[in-house]
């Protein structure tokens, strides 16, 4: 077992546990957009950042394993600022018209944006407008894509097809 502190709570978790999994075992939810256990653990969204005592850089919690004696903060001011900036960057490349979206009210990105109190974007919007290929049997709306890689990983690892790319 590995002993560590998450948000000042002492916990013990099995070796090989990720910081995100350890936090969940402690009842702490770390926000995430791209994470799918055992399928997509690449930290593409950078939303799951946490602060680790003694480390200068914030670290992603979905793909970093716990170590003995770590002291982790999941919601420090530094983490909140970085998380908000990362979501704002994602939104700057996303069709940010939630009111007319079919997923409105059932969207992790929308919920996270609301939780982070994101009202406007400090970055210039760059939404990719690519026409749909009506001859291809699957539909992918590039204006909604947040480049999380989930669809690509599920297609590769679950379906074994490998037909998607960003």
PLM region descriptions:
Residues 9-17:
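Short, contiguous acidic and Ser/Thr-rich linear segments
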Residues 46-166:
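Fe-S ferredoxin-like electron-transfer domains
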Residues 17-21, 65:
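Short, structural beta-strand-to-alpha-helix junction motif
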Residues 28-30:
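Cysteine-rich modules of extracellular adhesion/ECM and protease-associated proteins
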Residues 1-3:
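Extreme N-terminal starter segment of soluble prokaryotic enzymes
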Residues 6-9, 53-54:
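Short strand-turn-strand beta-turns centered on an Asx-Gly dipeptide
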Residues 32, 36-39:
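Charged, low-complexity terminal tails
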């Amino acid at each position: 077992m590995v002993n560590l502190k998450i948000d000042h709570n002492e916990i013990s978790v099995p070796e090989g546990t990720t910081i995100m999994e350890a936090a969940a075992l402690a009842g702490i939810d770390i926000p995430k957009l791209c994470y799918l256990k055992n399928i997509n653990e690449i930290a593409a969204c950078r939303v799951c950042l946490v602060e680790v005592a003694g480390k200068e850089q914030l670290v992603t919690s979905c793909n970093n394993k716990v170590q003995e004696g770590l002291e982790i903060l999941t919601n420090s001011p530094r983490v909140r600022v970085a998380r908000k900036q990362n979501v704002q960057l994602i939104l700057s490349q996303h069709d940010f018209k939630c009111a007319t979206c079919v997923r409105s009210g059932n969207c992790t990105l929308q919920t996270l944006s609301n939780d982070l109190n994101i009202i406007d974007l400090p970055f210039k919007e760059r939404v990719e407008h690519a026409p749909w290929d009506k001859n291809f049997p699957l539909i992918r709306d590039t204006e909604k894509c947040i480049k999380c890689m989930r669809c690509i990983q599920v297609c590769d690892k679950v379906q074994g097809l490998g037909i998607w790319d960003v």
